[in-house]
Curated annotation (Swiss-Prot):
PROSITE patterns: GNAT. The gene is ectA. GO terms for biological process: ectoine biosynthetic process. This is L-2,4-diaminobutyric acid acetyltransferase. Keywords: Acyltransferase, Transferase.
Amino acid sequence: MRKDETSNTSPDISVAQPASALRYHLRPPRRNDGAAIHQLVSECPPLDLNSLYAYLLLCEHHAHTCVVAESPGGRIDGFVSAYLLPTRPDVLFVWQVAVHSRARGHRLGRAMLGHILERQECRHVRHLETTVGPDNQASRRTFAGLAGERGAHVSEQPFFDRQAFGGADHDDEMLLRIGPFTHPPH
């Protein structure tokens, strides 16, 4: 059994919905989750859909810094891709946060981010960085909420302007930097 296939002893999180409560198991992605993650991201506009191969590589090479939210029926309704920056290993860079529409509005994205930060492999992380488009208010709320939970500051600066995307119809990407993380969440 591979390291990322071992049982996860962290508790499931409850995500309350108006008429019921769904329980999601948060765990590192496995190699065989790649296709389901690719499908999930395709159903989560405005996220950029990467190749299936890219998601397979994330599952294989970065499982320790990525997470899936799995429903009791085994459906993947959430995914966060992230990695430690090679030149600054105390910085976790979050690439994508995908939450299916059926699971939105219950802070699942924030819970998945917190789950990654609590892993042993990320105990040394002092900052989280991510990029967001200027109009992506849902992502901005998620990251602001995470910063508030952890008593951290959020700063913003330009990262990629639209010209960097080679003429593709793409918004500017702003870099959000959250940290430093000085204490566990309350």
